[in-house]
Amino acid sequence: MAAATLRDPAQQGYVTFEDVAVYFSQEEWRLLDDAQRLLYRNVMLENFTLLASLGLASSKTHEITQLESWEEPFMPAWEVVTSAILRGSWQGAKAEAAAEQSASVEVPSSNVQQHQKQHCGEKPLKRQEGRVPVLRSCRVHLSEKSLQSREVGKDLLTSSGVLKHQVTHTGEKSHRSSKSREAFHAGKRHYKCSECGKAFGQKYLLVQHQRLHTGEKPYECSECGKLFSHKSNLFIHQIVHTGERPYGCSDCGKSFSRNADLIQHQRVHTGEKPFTCSECGKAFRHNSTLVQHHRIHTGVRPYECSECGKLFSFNSSLMKHQRVHTGERPYKCSECGKFYSHKSSLINHWRVHTGERPYECSECGKFFSQSSSLMQHRKVHTGEKPFKCNECGRFFSENSSLVKHQRVHTGAKPYECRECGKFFRHSSSLVKHRRIHTGEIQ
């Protein structure tokens, strides 16, 4: 890096808003994610402070105060900037006012000429319709890449782009400006939460954080009445009502209303699973899925059935269970019209019509239509009999066999013949008995 001393500002004419602004269109602004917009807000504040210290902003206190207390950093602040411009804060301000503030800066030799072009003669103030001004200091180094990337509005907000502070300003500055800049670069956090002790570098971040403790949600959607703790979340939510989906997947063309949703979706194509369970090492595509999975290890069951009090780890499991009480059977077989309460039950039933038997016994090669049938069959090979009769101590390989056996002890005969009213302990016995009435058995 070669040191280059800037020309005497007094020889460079007037500084206008065009000299210290980069524009984004509304479309370009949408390409920025929340983190980039937050960085934009932070550097806006720094640039305002710098311009004020150089005597280039007559309404220093008002503008800086607005930015410091700016509650929502994710929305464009061109209203603040424009109001200052229209009042003539910069228009016609001579660069010689900052002559005693001149400094030596580190500039790549290949970019010295380009860097000096910032300080050319007076240009008329001209507001570009529909574009968002992003302030930058006339002492901020601009890389060629940053200037070329204005079309997409991405590198302009990266750490290597136009918003990165690459120079230390020397000379006399106001006490407030120096203190603000020192805190900005040193990463100091003066605003502390009285509830949890977490500290923040800027007041608006503390205000937003405190809503976690108070539960305050001051932003209401005018369409559906839903409340939000942050204005940015409200703006993102409102896209649902407009139907706008500006974020498109380059792999499959699917569109999303939020950039975060697009990022999550792209993991389907990349196979990325960044969320890993610390207990078993299983990886997941979404953090919410990991949170749900973790309940398997902790045993947490936060969802309770209001009818019977049974607890569930997942809300989806509770909803399925509640169909036992409501009798709801939303899944219908298109072949025979039979209804089922669970989709998995319909899938299993469908194999009756298709004849599909996807489950094979590794011991004898026999196929089954349901995995439960295969599991029961395997006990024939293993000799396992986990079901014990409490009356006589006899063991059975299947629970259904135990239930049938227990009727010997209870005397239960649940199967009735409609012809003669006779009862039977097993359905197979009833089937045989019916043949007497049909004439099959003489």
From Swiss-Prot:
This is Zinc finger protein 773. It is found in: Nucleus. May be involved in transcriptional regulation. Its main location: nucleus. InterPro entries: Ikaros_C2H2-ZF, KRAB, KRAB_dom_sf, Znf_C2H2_sf, Znf_C2H2_type. A zinc finger (C2H2-type) spans 191-213, 219-241, 247-269, 275-297, 303-325, 331-353, 359-381, 387-409, 415-437. Belongs to the krueppel C2H2-type zinc-finger protein family. PANTHER family: ZINC FINGER PROTEIN (PTHR24404), ZINC FINGER PROTEIN 613 (PTHR24404:SF41). GO terms for molecular function: DNA-binding transcription factor activity, RNA polymerase II-specific; RNA polymerase II cis-regulatory region sequence-specific DNA binding; zinc ion binding. The gene is ZNF773. Residues 15-86 form the KRAB domain. PROSITE patterns: KRAB, ZINC_FINGER_C2H2_1, ZINC_FINGER_C2H2_2. Keywords: DNA-binding, Metal-binding, Nucleus, Repeat, Transcription, Transcription regulation, Zinc, Zinc-finger. GO terms for biological process: regulation of transcription by RNA polymerase II. Gene3D superfamilies: 6.10.140.140, Classic Zinc Finger (3.30.160.60). GO terms for cellular component: nucleus. It comes from the Eukaryota.
